[in-house]
Amino acid sequence: MKKVKLAEIAEIFSGLSYRRYLDDKGIDFHVIVQRSIKKDGELSDFDNLKLSDFKDRYFTRKGDVLMKMPYPYDVVCVKEEGLVVSDRIAIIRVEKGYDPDFIAHMLTNAHIKKQLHELGSSQKLPHTSLKEIKELELVLPDYDTQVKYGELLNTINEKIAEDLKVVEYDRNLKEGILNQLWEAQ
């Protein structure tokens, strides 16, 4: 196991401040905004916007790790290329030799939340900066171990997502039964 700062193993920069690039004659893009990054590594619910003339660095690449900069600092490892990342989201491009899935899971850990709290501002709505994200210290095993843990933790996240769908289905079923009772009156 070795201790490293995130900036030592990744390029880290902010997403696109897309409002400057809005253009009715531009190209349609799926834009990752704050609500797109969900707890437990889920990525969905994009904005569809017409944009023009911005740098390729703001397009997702497979293996990018995205982190919300406002609290609760949700994190996701990107599987789909070509999405546009908006501002207030840190794009973390992990170097070869490190597993992005594992790094994404590490960034959701309580030790990282504690570091962000200690490094961060004392505002009512906590927010972190790129400088603070670059200073985060991670304890990393060798690459093969990272891959194994990354796969295991991905499987656990998938199970959590499925379990939450079952809970939502059961809530809807309960509500439907109660509504039928009201309608039977």
Task: Describe every region a protein language model picked out.
Residues 51-74, 133:
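Short hydrophobic interaction/assembly module
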Residues 32, 92, 136:
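Hydrophobic residues at beta-strand termini and immediately following loops
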Residues 101-123:
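Glycine- and charge-enriched low-complexity intrinsically disordered segments
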Residues 67-108:
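A short beta-sheet element
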Residues 84-87, 122-147:
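A short glycine-rich beta-alpha junction/loop motif
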Residues 4-20, 34-62:
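Sequence-specific dsDNA recognition surfaces
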Residues 1-21, 25-27, 135, 140-185:
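Non-catalytic DNA-recognition/assembly elements of restriction-modification systems
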Residues 22-29, 58-60, 77-88:
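Short, surface-exposed loop/turn microsegments at beta-strand edges and helix-strand junctions
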